[in-house]
Amino acid sequence: KIAGLKLHTNGVLVVGMSEIEGQDKKRHKPYENTGIEEGDTIIKINETEIGSTNQLIETVNLSKGNSIQVKFIHEEETKECSITPVQTSSNEYKLGLWVRDSAAGVGTVTFYEPSTKTFGALGHGITDIDTNELINIASGEFITTRVLNITKGESGEPGKIQGTIENQQNIGTISKNSKFGIYGRVDNLSSLNVDTSKEMEVALRNEIQLGKATILCSLDNQKPQEYE
């Protein structure tokens, strides 16, 4: 089964840094010597918990150029620093940081366990496209998707599943993003559209053999079909 995934970060992820032109027409790097690096997560500014990019922008603008205390996570260690926002010609205050607070995509559901209503998907974690760091999530949505195309994998080139997650139904919630996959709970089983009467036993590691592999997929909400 193919499903859509929307992840919301715990704090905001720093995905880049750039110089800022201030009102004085000079170039500034307010992030310099703060210890903040790409891949870090900003979780608090002064006494405000940061949960989105918009909240960070608003909080920085409220500083009016005064020094602010930033709490961030660097390689699983919580750190703090002082940083002074730079006023731009448009009267905005900026830190010179590019940040992101969410990610989305489609992927295969690995399993659904009826007795606990839990699911696993992807078989690998979701990393940020810019930093390649595993995204530390605060919450997530598990939603239906419309599959548009499946590209078979070839030697040296992995296969791809393309789909859209716009205007789709909620299936459940995502609680964990790990290097082994995405995990969560199914709240709306009818939206997942699976036949729970046909359970399949998961093979043990020592039972797996090299050979042809197939996926079961529903294209355009039709009955599941098998694809090599």
Which residue ranges define each predicted feature?
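Conserved PDZ fold ligand-binding element
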Residues: 31-54
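Terminal peptide-recognition signature
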Residues: 14, 31, 39-42, 70, ...
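N-terminal targeting leaders that route proteins to membranes or the secretory/organellar pathways
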Residues: 1-13, 54, 65-67
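PDZ/PDZ-like groove recognition
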Residues: 4-37
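Short, surface-exposed secondary-structure boundary micro-motifs
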Residues: 47-48, 73, 218
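PDZ-domain C-terminal substructure recognizer with occasional recognition of PDZ-binding tails
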Residues: 3, 37, 57-96
